[in-house]
Amino acid sequence: MSDFNLRRYYTSNQLLKFSNEYPKSMTEIKKGELKGYDIFTSSTINMVVGNLLRDVQNRIDQADQIEKRS
């Protein structure tokens, strides 16, 4: 597996892991079972997720550019 494919695989798995945990986190917040987490408003959660997705897309774009150069 090339370095590029490995990076893309790792990134997509991290995103999948986060998306699988995200609904559980929302449920814990709704039930009030915060387990030491701060209470986030939905706008804060949306901002965090938006930033994460933008960062992931930037990394994929950078990897695409590196692959095109080589």
Curated annotation (Swiss-Prot):
Official protein name in the record: Uncharacterized protein PJ695.02
Organism: Schizosaccharomyces pombe (strain 972 / ATCC 24843) (Fission yeast)
